């Protein structure tokens, strides 16, 4: 089976072609970072308009790169949600229209399921069951995964997600958009400076996350300290360590609760070097395994949508003719794949 994947949930237009026998045949991506940089964040209306401009040329390029004609496709997968409704509808309209015109089945994919399954694109793909840590700009959650569509959300953000906390803290430090990667780069220059940042919600049972208080603590620390480059780097390091430690503590709890020894990290924040190193050390000490996608598949992309959609299309699942976008969509409401 060969599937065209379309991702437009936020500020990246991602198109890919995936074949269940040959693997990933093509992967094209357009990022709107420069478009939104002047505003310090994603402007939904501008994002939607840019998706409209870029999506068809990218589809043509992806099909050309994959040496694939319309007749070679067995289905089309597009991101249905969660995300920005205008951006979602661009991908949904184009995907559903192509499916109708080409007489192909179509499937609306859950964006976070795409991230969750992204490590399956690697040669050392994880086997079920495992615990997944999904960390991005809009989501932080721990999921018990027993199979595709067999998900139990063990804990999630009650306010700011980890990626959102990175971006907002970067803005407090005067760093340019996108803030998260820039903050991590600054943190790499930091030194242990005796800051005692809190590890939110680790002093109580449970697997939920909360990073808004940590962001406020960081803002107060910035205001109280000298405004020089090394001090800012030290604060960035202390903030990053607090976020990473919090995520690691919760992951350890989730593994103990489930009895599983495999951990998947996915989503934009999974590209963070300190997070990868910390969780790799933790899993090594526990005698377990950790899996994550390559860097280009940590952020939003069409490859993960093509792969996730193919799994459901193979199981006979598909959408009706209606064009739908779901800006809010609980992961654990998805049907299982038999």
Curated annotation (Swiss-Prot):
Example GO CC term: the record gives: cytoplasm
The EC number(s) given in the record are: 2.3.1.234
The UniProt annotation places substrate binding at 134-138, 167, 180, 272
The record's catalysed reaction(s) read: L-threonylcarbamoyladenylate + adenosine(37) in tRNA = N(6)-L-threonylcarbamoyladenosine(37) in tRNA + AMP + H(+)
Enumerate the GO terms in the molecular function aspect: iron ion binding; N(6)-L-threonylcarbamoyladenine synthase activity
Q: Does the keyword DNA damage apply?
A: no
What family classification does the UniProt entry report for this protein? Belongs to the KAE1 / TsaD family.
Biological process (GO), any one: tRNA threonylcarbamoyladenosine modification
Tell me the residue numbers annotated for binding Fe cation. 111, 115, 300
Q: What is written in the cofactor note of this entry?
A: Binds 1 Fe(2+) ion per subunit.
- Locations listed in the record: Cytoplasm
Quick check: keyword ATP-binding in the entry?
A: no
Species in which this protein is naturally found? Shewanella baltica (strain OS185)
Could you say which enzyme class this protein belongs to? transferase
Per the entry, what this protein does is: Required for the formation of a threonylcarbamoyl group on adenosine at position 37 (t(6)A37) in tRNAs that read codons beginning with adenine. Is involved in the transfer of the threonylcarbamoyl moiety of threonylcarbamoyl-AMP (TC-AMP) to the N6 group of A37, together with TsaE and TsaB. TsaD likely plays a direct catalytic role in this reaction.
Q: Which InterPro entries match?
A: ATPase_NBD (IPR043129), Gcp-like_dom (IPR000905), KAE1/TsaD (IPR017861), Peptidase_M22_CS (IPR017860), TsaD (IPR022450)
Q: In its UniProt entry, what is this protein called?
A: tRNA N6-adenosine threonylcarbamoyltransferase
